[in-house]
Amino acid sequence: MNELIKHKLELLPDSPGCYLHKDKEGTIIYVGKAKNLKKRVRSYFRGSHDTKTELLVSEIVDFEYIVTESDTEALLLEINLIQKNMPKYNIKLKDDKSYPFLKITNESFPRLVITRYIKKNDGLYFGPYPDSYTANEVKKLLDRIFPFKKCKNPINKVCFYYHLGQCCAHTICHTDKAYWDRLIDDVKHFLNGKDDKIIEDLRSKMLAASEEMAFERAAEYRDLISGIATMRTKQRVMSKDLQDRDIFGYYVDKGWMCVQVFFVRQGKLIQRDVNLFPYYNDAEEDFLTYMGQFYQDKQHFIPKEVFIPEAIDEELVAAIVPTKIIKPKRGEKKQLVALATKNARVSLQQKFDLLEKDIKKTSGAIDNLGHLLGINKPVRIEAFDNSNIQGTSPVAAMVVFVDGKPSKKDYRKFKVKTVVGPDDYASMREVLFRRYSRVKKEGLQAPNLIIVDGGVGQVNVAKDVIEKQLGLTIPVAGLQKNDKHQTHDLLFGNPLEVVPLPRRSEEFFLLHRIQDEVHRFAVTFHRQVRRKNSFSSTLDHISGLGPKRKQLLLRHFKTITAIASATSEEIQALGIPKTVVEAIQQQITDNKNDRSSP
């Protein structure tokens, strides 16, 4: 804890409000709310915490706070601050959490469409449906039963669907409002499970078609009836009152929370939503934050009722969710919340079981790898790869795996400084010497195994640097790719030889992952350097364009092509004088002409 934090902790009020933790860059990494700011914020810097909270606290170098009039106001503010700043340690709802709805548009000639977004007063919405496939299947069925307009043809034309009896052309379909009201009512009844009348009507048409010997038409009606029956069986009835409601349950264990939401429409369970995340405050408070984000996202339909667990404050939920909030006390409704809670517990336990299996697999892979190579268990592995195009902008990268998992805070990038032209061996020699001379000089943690991306030549260079130049005793292995650029052979030993490695073994998958990761990291860094070098060389020697303005252009436009496409006004908006903008545009034009000249 630094002096700034110590001083600020003394000034905290005993009031409700929100606090914002910041890292060394000034970035907001966590937003929380508290009934008592002094007690809550001080708790982060006193006593012991679990591992994930320790990690959060280790990054805090400053904090701010905002005092509110009430706990409810603090909750609303917290939700807004999280959505605005997207702190990395706060609950994040998945990006793909929107569900499809069926919508009847409020156009003069209504259409039936699928959408994932709800707009107020923009039509009638039905759903949500669990996925696009289900929504499309229901829509196909409705299209065959109800002749909504399906095209955007001009008023004097009909479309293909009109000839199938599935589209109502502008000039032919009924234009009176009563017709459309009846059609929309029929769809509403159908989607709300009141489809007996529609089935009876279809059955009458099927029998009539059979009597007229129109067997193909009769078969179509039969298929429609079958489709309705299938849709009925896919929905589980959870409640007899046919009400639309969302049912929430949650469970916490080992610093993690799982929230389950059952979407019930017309008494039928149509989908559930599962979200697991670490929590840092009281479970009830983090659950409230989750609910606030869940419904503030416009992709979620707000039902007539929301059921919540016993421990949650109804008034606080009512402040953030504009619908009827119910905390069931007994009977079927309480059992529904209990069912959601039970499912949350099962999902969370499943996560822990999978994590435990993954840990056992990874640990086994490291043990087996050490046994195969005849070395101590390689808990820490450092892997290297070069990247360049015909020797231009040569770079290298190092990735670190600890206990079989990437330790990204230990990753390193290297710009090759002493090598001219495409010489991978010399580049590897320089980078390894720089890395491990520093490890030796500064007493940094050394790896249990070094892996280089390459064959015999690369491994021999690495061993020469490590053993002969630096006098270190760190095992060195090589990962060699085949002609399809896939991990193929593990090279190790003295003399070097291929280590037999079963392709389906956990240790092979671990090495494959390490090689892919170091290659990705090196190539990504090389692209960044190449782009920056290209950017800088084009803008060199322009009067009035110094390093800061170049950096500003690079951050905003990313590429020279983007600058070339920008207007003078767009570039000047960055605070660059008009005369300099004109010089930039002239330089880009001259370079383009030079490249196109024979």
UniProtKB/Swiss-Prot annotation:
GO terms of molecular function: DNA binding; excinuclease ABC activity
Cross-referenced SMART domains: GIYc
Pfam families reported for this sequence: GIY-YIG, HHH_5, UVR, UvrC_RNaseH, UvrC_RNaseH_dom
Compartments where located: Cytoplasm
InterPro entries for this protein: GIY-YIG_endonuc, GIY-YIG_endonuc_sf, GIY-YIG_UvrC_Cho, RuvA_2-like, UVR_dom, UVR_dom_sf, UvrABC_protein_C, UvrC
Residue intervals of the UVR domain: 196-231
Domain (GIY-YIG): residue spans on this chain: 14-91
Predominant localisation class: cytoplasm
Keywords, comma-separated and alphabetical: Cytoplasm, DNA damage, DNA excision, DNA repair, Excision nuclease, SOS response
GO cellular component: cytoplasm; excinuclease repair complex
UniProt record, GO biological process: nucleotide-excision repair; SOS response
Role of this protein: The UvrABC repair system catalyzes the recognition and processing of DNA lesions. UvrC both incises the 5' and 3' sides of the lesion. The N-terminal half is responsible for the 3' incision and the C-terminal half is responsible for the 5' incision.
Annotated family: Belongs to the UvrC family.
Subunit structure: Interacts with UvrB in an incision complex.
Protein name: UvrABC system protein C
Native source organism of the sequence: Streptococcus pyogenes serotype M18 (strain MGAS8232)
Origin organism lineage: Bacteria, Bacillati, Bacillota, Bacilli, Lactobacillales
